[in-house]
């Protein structure tokens, strides 16, 4: 206990961890989601979380090869962990609007859908669906 008290809140070891599973609306609470499903995001990535947190002025860094222990899929898309500094050297908050780890997670989940990468992906998907609808043709005879 004394060892933990001796370390500064500004040490990178003391930054909070945010895994993409914490914000994923496809996950249940048992699978690792930590915010309400109504506020969660569909399949967030660690880089998106990092982009949102660094844009607001938080001190963040990305650990690409870290995996969430409850994540069964070992695909590269699901890897990553973001470390965020909440408290400064003297113990005061870095940003007053983020007093807790939950406030950071809720903010990230709110801002990720507004990222340019998210808005461009949805626009491109609509166009490809419309193009695909016009070219549907019958397959022909069934083979016996």
Curated annotation (Swiss-Prot):
One of its GO terms (cellular component) is signal recognition particle. Residues 117-144 are annotated as: Disordered. Signal peptide: none annotated. GO terms for molecular function: 7S RNA binding; RNA binding. GO terms for biological process: cotranslational protein targeting to membrane; SRP-dependent cotranslational protein targeting to membrane, signal sequence recognition. Keywords: Cytoplasm, Nucleus, Ribonucleoprotein, RNA-binding, Signal recognition particle. Component of a signal recognition particle complex that consists of a 7SL RNA molecule of 300 nucleotides and 6 protein subunits: SRP72, SRP68, SRP54, SRP19, SRP14 and SRP9. Interacts with IPO5, IPO7, IPO8, KPNB1 and TNPO1. Interactions with IPO8 and TNPO1 may be involved in SRP19 import into the nucleus. This is Signal recognition particle 19 kDa protein. It comes from Homo sapiens (Human).
């Amino acid at each position: 206990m004394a060892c933990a008290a001796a370390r500064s809140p500004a040490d990178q070891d003391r930054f909070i961890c945010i895994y993409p599973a914490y914000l994923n609306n496809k996950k249940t609470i048992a699978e690792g989601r930590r915010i309400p499903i109504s506020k969660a995001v569909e399949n967030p990535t660690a880089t998106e979380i990092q982009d949102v947190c660094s844009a607001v002025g938080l001190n963040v860094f990305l650990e690409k090869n870290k995996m969430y222990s409850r994540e069964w899929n070992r695909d590269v898309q699901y890897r990553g962990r973001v470390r965020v500094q909440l408290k400064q050297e003297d113990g005061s908050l870095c940003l007053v609007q983020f007093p807790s780890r939950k406030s950071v997670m809720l903010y990230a989940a709110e801002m990720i859908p507004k990222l340019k990468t998210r808005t461009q992906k949805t626009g491109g998907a609509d166009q490809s669906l419309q193009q695909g609808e016009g070219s549907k043709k019958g397959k022909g005879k069934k083979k016996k």
